[in-house]
């Protein structure tokens, strides 16, 4: 407690001394700020001391106090900034500005407004100092006239301060537990806790505002002392090549800042990259001087070392000049040799240069990566570190010159990317078309392969005017018998699902026969006694296709009706010219216009017609039913009277099982019905024959 009171009295005395004169004592102000930053005095006590000094009625004292406060704000550390940005201090300034009894001096008021504006501009984006900005905006709203704004960086308020102390039960270096005999000691540089053996060194810490020697641990002591001796201990070419330049260009912080945030290796790499960028990537032999090989002198002779450094500088400069001259001569000789010996290669070698002019060199790429690494390191360092490292600024300028080249390289890369995307889309389209073609070929191959195992419908090369008939009938009866004798066929028969137009000749045939159907004699079948030669069967071959030519009226009847009883495996139907007796003239006279009717024999595949006919067997067929088959196959009319016209009901019969019928009619086939009374297409409804009923009854009576 005694130490606190003594420190408070010390800060009060120093503040009073610094603000007693009308002239600003910069040295004393910096000493006070270092005392606050080193935490030699409590920041709240320092703030209250400055606040009491501002309440003095003397304007000169008020102005000096304001200047001292500004110096302490910029160098006192974050812990003091928090006290200045508190309501206690800022509200006191506002109350001084709004004093009504004794008006504030104009100079003091202007200085106070200027400082509030500067602090608010520098504290932007910091939540712990947000009240300064609120006060500034409130004064603006109340109509206070502030001076013109000046751009102030936030790093103005940044200053290094001793870290907060860290507590632990063991030494953070040797891990020895603390006890009554082994006491704790905090390092003033890093804030960690160590025992007496690991923190026996003492050093002043001017970068933290601590000017007297304080306790530090062995690690911080080695780090701080090695950084002070690092330029003389480096042995690489960067150290002895640019030793004097580095010493003069590096901006060391006040008092020799030790915690720069960069390691020696990183500094060395930064210097080497800058040198390589300046030399444009050229390399050459660097002869080492003899002075480097000499052992270092004792540090007790500074004058001799300075003389040796001067000699070393002269030797290095001479070697550098020789190296540059050697490189220039070598480059000129290489250029002349390449131009004289290989003239033909100049054009091909010069061609890629414009193409690769936008590409980054390895040195430039390395500089970009190094700059990115340095910027990442700066994220974990105090904001003022970037101002103390001129190498970062130089590297930023060198990288900024690469923006056009980098933009062009990026544009070229994007154009290549777009081209590759277009090519990929085209390849995808080609692959899709190729897959579709393979699928079509595969499906066609499967279709051709399945033709040998299942009846696949196909276009017939010949026109067909006959209706579909079943290939086989149960019990040895063919589809032809069922056509003539089954009266259930007309009810169960289904028309083709897809109608197709009939060829023109069939339509003409239909018109011709249809016009004659009304004049046909009812006694066409009135001569059942005419003998018919049974020598030639109607089904001659399994796969033969015949197209009989039009013949006379005597060839209008089929050969042998008994041939229908045999098993008819093939599905073709055609007529053969029958052998008619010479005395068959009544039949010829009954059909006078028959030679005009054309015959078209074509194979018909019979499928898809389930039926159960009740027709009798083929041997029971009367002889007068044979001539009806000579005109072609015809669907049974749905009228029962019309069905009696073609065939009477048999006395006995066995019902046939349903027989499937496949292969629908295709466009290549011409399906039609040819009957003694007319020809009807497959897709048109059946027209009943036009002969009157009485002739039919007379013919049945005659039978």
Curated annotation (Swiss-Prot):
Biased amino acid composition, Polar residues: 279-290, 335-350
Residues covered by region (Disordered): 276-306, 323-357, 568-703
UniProt keyword Ribosomal protein present: no
PROSITE patterns: UIM, VHS, ZF_FYVE
Annotated GO biological process: protein targeting to vacuole; protein transport to vacuole involved in ubiquitin-dependent protein catabolic process via the multivesicular body sorting pathway
Main location: membrane
Designated gene of the protein: vps27
Quaternary assembly: Component of the ESCRT-0 complex composed of HSE1 and VPS27.
Claim: NADP is one of the keywords in the record: no
One Pfam short name: FYVE
SUPFAM superfamilies named among the record's database cross-references: ENTH/VHS domain, FYVE/PHD zinc finger
GO terms for MF: phosphatidylinositol-3-phosphate binding; ubiquitin binding; zinc ion binding
Record-annotated UIM domain positions: 261-280, 307-326
Protein name: Vacuolar protein sorting-associated protein 27
ZnF FYVE-type span: 165-225
Comp. bias regions, Basic and acidic residues: 580-594
Start-end of Pro residues biased regions: 648-658
Residue span(s) of domain VHS: 16-147
Family under the similarity heading: Belongs to the VPS27 family.
Highest taxon of the lineage: Eukaryota
GO CC, one annotated term: endosome membrane
Function: Component of the ESCRT-0 complex which is the sorting receptor for ubiquitinated cargo proteins at the multivesicular body (MVB) and recruits ESCRT-I to the MVB outer membrane.
Membrane-topology descriptor: Peripheral membrane protein
Subcellular location: Endosome membrane
Comment block on domains: The FYVE domain is involved in the binding to phosphatidylinositol 3-phosphate (PtdIns(3)P) which is required for the association to endosomal membranes. Both IUM domains are necessary for efficient binding to ubiquitin.
Biased composition (Low complexity): 291-303
UniProt keyword annotations, A-Z: Endosome, Membrane, Metal-binding, Repeat, Zinc, Zinc-finger
């Amino acid at each position: 407690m005694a130490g606190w009171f003594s420190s408070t009295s010390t800060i009060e005395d120093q503040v009073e001394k610094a603000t007693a004169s009308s002239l600003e004592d910069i040295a004393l102000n910096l000493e006070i700020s270092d005392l606050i930053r080193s935490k030699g005095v409590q920041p709240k006590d320092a703030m209250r001391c400055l606040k009491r000094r501002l309440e003095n009625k003397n304007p000169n004292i008020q102005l000096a106090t304001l200047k001292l406060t500004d110096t302490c704000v910029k160098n006192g550390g974050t812990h003091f900034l928090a006290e200045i940005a508190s309501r206690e201090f800022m509200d006191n300034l506002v109350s001084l500005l709004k004093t009504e009894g004794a008006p504030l001096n104009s100079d003091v008021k202007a200085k106070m407004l200027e400082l509030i504006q500067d602090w608010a501009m520098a504290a932007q984006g910091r939540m712990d100092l947000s009240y300064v900005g609120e006060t500034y905006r409130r004064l603006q709203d109340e109509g206070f006239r502030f001076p013109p704004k000046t751009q102030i960086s936030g790093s103005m308020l940044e200053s290094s301060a001793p870290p907060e102390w860290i507590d632990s039960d063991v030494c953070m270096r040797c891990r020895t537990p603390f006890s009554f005999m082994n006491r704790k000691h905090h390092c003033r540089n890093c804030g960690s806790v160590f025992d007496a053996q690991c923190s026996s060194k003492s050093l002043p810490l001017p970068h933290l505002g601590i000017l007297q020697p304080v306790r530090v641990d062995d690690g911080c002591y080695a780090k701080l002392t090695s950084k002070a001796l690092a330029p003389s201990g480096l042995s690489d070419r960067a150290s002895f090549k640019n030793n004097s330049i580095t010493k003069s260009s590096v901006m060391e912080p006040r008092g020799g800042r030790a915690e720069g945030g960069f390691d020696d290796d990183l500094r060395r790499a930064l210097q080497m990259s800058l040198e390589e960028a300046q030399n444009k990537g050229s390399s050459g032999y660097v002869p080492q001087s003899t002075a480097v090989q000499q052992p270092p002198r004792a540090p007790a002779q500074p004058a001799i070392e300075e003389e040796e450094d001067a000699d070393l500088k002269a030797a290095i400069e001479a070697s550098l000049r020789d190296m540059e001259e050697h490189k220039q001569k070598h480059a000129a000789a290489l250029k002349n040799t390449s131009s004289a010996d290989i003239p033909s290669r100049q054009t091909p070698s010069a061609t890629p240069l414009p193409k690769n002019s936008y590409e980054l060199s390895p040195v430039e790429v390395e500089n970009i990566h190094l700059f990115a690494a340095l910027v990442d390191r700066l994220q974990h360092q105090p904001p003022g570190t970037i101002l103390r490292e001129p190498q970062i600024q130089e590297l930023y300028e060198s990288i900024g010159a690469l923006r056009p080249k980098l933009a062009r390289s990026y544009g070229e890369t994007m154009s290549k990317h777009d081209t590759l995307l277009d090519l990929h889309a085209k390849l995808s389209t080609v692959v899709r078309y190729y897959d579709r073609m393979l699928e079509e070929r595969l499906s066609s191959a499967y279709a051709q392969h399945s033709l040998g195992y299942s009846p696949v419908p196909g276009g017939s090369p010949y026109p067909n005017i006959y209706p579909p008939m079943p290939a086989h009938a149960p019990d040895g009866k063919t589809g032809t018998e069922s056509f003539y004798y089954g009266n259930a066929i007309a009810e169960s028969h289904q028309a083709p699902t897809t109608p197709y137009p009939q060829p023109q000749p069939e339509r003409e045939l239909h018109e011709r026969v249809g016009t004659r159907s009304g004049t046909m004699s009812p006694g066409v079948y009135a001569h059942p006694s005419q003998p018919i030669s049974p020598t030639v069967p109607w089904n001659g071959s399994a796969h033969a296709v015949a197209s009989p030519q039009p013949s006379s009226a005597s060839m209008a009847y089929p050969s042998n009706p008994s041939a229908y009883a045999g098993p008819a495996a093939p599905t073709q139907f055609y007529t053969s010219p029958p052998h008619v007796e010479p005395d068959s003239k009544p039949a010829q006279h009954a059909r006078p216009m028959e030679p005009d009717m054309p015959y078209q024999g074509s194979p018909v595949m019979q499928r898809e017609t389930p039926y159960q006919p009740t027709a009798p067997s083929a041997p029971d067929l009367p002889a007068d039913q044979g001539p009806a088959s000579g005109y072609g196959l015809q669907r049974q009319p749905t009228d029962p009277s019309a069905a009696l016209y073609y065939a009477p009901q048999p006395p006995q019969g066995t019902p046939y099982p349903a027989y499937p019928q496949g292969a629908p009619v295709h466009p290549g086939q011409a399906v039609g019905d040819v009957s003694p009374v007319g020809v009807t297409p497959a897709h048109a409804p059946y027209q009943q024959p036009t002969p009157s009923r009485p002739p039919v009854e007379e013919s049945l009576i005659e039978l």
